A protein has these predicted regions:
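Short glycine-/polar-rich loops that comprise or flank the Walker A/P-loop
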Residues: 1, 78-84, 136-141
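ATP-dependent small-molecule kinase phosphotransfer cores
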Residues: 2-73, 77, 105, 115
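Residue-level signature of catalytic and energy-coupling elements of molecular machines
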Residues: 7, 43, 57, 86, ...
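Conserved nucleotide-binding/hydrolysis micro-motifs of P-loop NTPases
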Residues: 8-11, 62-66, 89-96, 149-150
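A glycine- and Lys/Arg-enriched "phosphate-lid" helix/loop adjacent to the NTP-binding pocket
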Residues: 26-27, 75-127
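Conserved phosphate/pyrophosphate-binding and hydrolysis machinery centered on Walker-type P-loop NTPases
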Residues: 37, 61, 88, 114, ...
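Short, well-ordered secondary-structure micro-motifs
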Residues: 68-69, 96-99, 154
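NTP-dependent small-molecule kinase module
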Residues: 122-169
Length: 169
């Protein structure tokens, strides 16, 4: 499986000054989510770079129902599909603390302001939470506790994947 991180794809496009990267950078600097079309177009390019393959692990994508439907269509064209989605459940105060800490080391403008972080969390509530229903209706949604060490969180993710694989054997 190929791991595709939306953040890595954004950073690559921004550092290469692609048209999509420059668009994304403008939105991110204002603390806004990157529009669906820009995100989907970047991810389509990335997916096509790795074809053919046996599948993907998407990190940070999709974030809206529109993106999910676009991804479903793209994967269908390649005889692939989403098998399961895993959401890390973290309270807003912990998220704010994590992002402010990340902002110190990354230099990301959108991680250095509580106001911008709160704007992103509000956008998340409005645009990303509907994905829970979208994937839940397909029996593809799993939520795990996203608080703890990286090893603890990884262990929870692995457990969900192993349970899924055991259920479908």
């Amino acid at each position: 499986l190929i791991h595709i991180s939306t953040g890595d794809v954004f950073r690559k496009n921004m550092s290469n000054n692609t048209d999509l990267g420059l668009l994304a950078k403008g939105f991110m600097e204002k603390g806004e989510l990157v529009p669906d079309k820009v995100t989907v177009d970047m991810l389509k390019d990335e997916i096509n770079n790795f074809m053919p393959c046996n599948g993907f692990i998407f990190d940070g994508f999709p974030r809206t129902t529109f993106q999910a439907k676009e991804l479903d269509n793209l994967l269908f064209e390649k005889s692939l599909k989403i098998d399961l989605t895993i959401a890390l459940n973290v309270d807003n105060n912990s998220l704010i603390d994590r992002l402010l800490e990340r902002g110190k080391s990354s230099g990301r403008a959108d991680d250095q302001s509580v106001e911008k972080i709160n704007m992103r969390l509000q956008e998340y509530d409005n645009k990303t939470k509907p994905l829970i229903e979208y994937y839940n209706d397909q029996n593809k949604f799993y939520s795990i506790n996203g608080i703890g060490s990286l090893e603890q969180i990884k262990s929870r993710i692995v457990e969900v994947i192993e349970d899924y694989n055991n259920d479908w054997r």
